[in-house]
């Protein structure tokens, strides 16, 4: 059994894409957040209704999602003089290496770098981080490990929406085993959930919009 598992692992496609060695200073333009290893991560911005926003929100999406997840809320925030930023994390949305897991250290390093760039762009405006599901987990881990940078980040607060807090260490062995085998044997498999015959929401307009979103 062990031998067969090793063979399967050897034949499986790569599932990880870690942070490369730093080659440049992180930067931010209208379309991309460019990381320290030169990776271009797409970024969206919803400007506040007034020239000077009363607050800034950096939104971090969840697993199998991307930066547009915050669109409805960001439009509301904009009308209330709040500017919102959101970016596609590595492996998600239009970011490079879609489908590959970048690793916790890489995702948190990206978040901290982008937070510092936004803080530098808006030095006197209250800055908040907003994370949904996996995005909430990325924020929590990043801030836990960022004691030395905490003052430079200058955060006014954190907003967590259904943060992902159930890690593998709390899962029974059969779940972690199934996840590992599936990820290393069928890394490109797509799970749609269609066979479950469950309606995700009674908001038909929202479901249609999601269906049309590439």
Residue ranges and their predicted role:
Residues 6-49:
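An N-terminal hydrophobic leader/cap segment in hydrolases
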Residues 60, 87-89, 161:
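Alpha/beta-hydrolase
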Residues 64-67, 92-126:
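Catalytic nucleophile-loop/oxyanion-hole region of alpha/beta-hydrolase
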Residues 74-98:
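Conserved alpha/beta-hydrolase
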Residues 53-62:
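Short beta-strand element of the alpha/beta-hydrolase
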Residues 134-214:
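Alpha/beta-hydrolase-fold enzymes
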Residues 63-75:
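The serine-hydrolase catalytic nucleophile loop
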